[in-house]
């Protein structure tokens, strides 16, 4: 398993916990909005920042389709 995949799993599980949602629901929402690959590809940015920064960026991606920064 790649570092990117490990981090993606860590990210989605922790994001779901933070939002008090089942992980499967978070993944389904990200898939419906076409965000899975974009979030996965953001590994270089997300893994070097506070995890809360990733959450904020994902929220913005979900609402606007654009990265926060």
What are these regions (language model features)?
Residues 1-25:
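N-terminal acidic leader/helix
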Residues 1-7, 40, 49-51:
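Charged, low-complexity, helix/coiled-coil-prone segments
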Residues 10, 14, 28, 41, ...:
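Charged/polar, solvent-exposed surface patches and flexible loops
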Residues 43-69:
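Long, compositionally biased
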